[in-house]
């Protein structure tokens, strides 16, 4: 039996640390967008460098778009693209499955 090449490529994205969580996080934000500082605050254990690298990766895959808003001061937000939102929609059933079947192994509690 051959493995689906599309699924294999998708797991190259989702199999990398933080990518799925960032996509899921943005999908739950107003307008599917957030400031870097909000993501850093809410994704508590990610370092600023790792977050920056992950957002760049996701932008290269056209899942996230960096938008610069010309205000004073200038604001930068990260927004899920249509492609990113479609992937986030596919992750929601996985999240529901995890809430039913995955046991948390540390001090985290479900939100």
Tell me what each language-model feature is:
Residues 19, 31, 63, 96-99, ...:
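Generic structural signal for secondary-structure transition and capping sites
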Residues 59-79:
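Beta-hairpin "wing" of winged helix-turn-helix
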Residues 38, 57, 86, 93-96:
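Residues on one face of amphipathic alpha-helical coiled coils
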Residues 5-50, 77:
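N-terminal helix-turn-helix DNA-binding core of bacterial DNA-binding proteins
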Residues 51, 55-58:
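Basic amphipathic alpha-helical segments that dock to polyanions
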Residues 72-93:
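Basic, amphipathic "hinge/linker" alpha-helix immediately C-terminal to the N-terminal HTH DNA-binding motif
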Residues 4, 89-111:
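Amphipathic alpha-helical dimerization/coiled-coil segments
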Residues 35, 67, 106-107:
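Short, hydrophobic secondary-structure boundary micro-motifs
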């Amino acid at each position: 039996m051959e493995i689906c090449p599309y699924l294999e490529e998708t797991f190259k994205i989702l199999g990398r640390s933080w990518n799925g969580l960032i996509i899921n996080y943005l999908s739950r934000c107003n307008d599917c967008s957030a400031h870097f500082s909000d993501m850093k605050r809410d994704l508590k254990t990610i370092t600023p460098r790792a977050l920056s690298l992950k957002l760049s990766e996701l932008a290269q895959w056209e899942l996230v778009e960096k938008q610069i808003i010309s205000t004073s001061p200038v604001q930068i937000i990260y927004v899920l693209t249509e492609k990113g939102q479609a992937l986030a929609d596919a992750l929601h059933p996985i999240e529901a499955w995890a809430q039913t079947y995955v046991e948390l192994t540390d001090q985290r509690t479900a939100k």
